[in-house]
């Protein structure tokens, strides 16, 4: 069984690719992507997989059945735009 999950995350500032332990929380993945892609840290973001928002963000990747290589979207929410 794989202990790592490779994520390819589409963001407003390009694609983020990174590998995380399967026990990494969604909120920690979001923080890493926001920092790497130089997105506004104060904005609220969600990770979306096949149209489904990955919530609650305290859950680990593995709890959503994410294994191997996975494509996600990072979507800004409630940024007051």
Task: Describe each model-derived feature in a short phrase.
Residues 1-81:
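Ubiquitin system architectures
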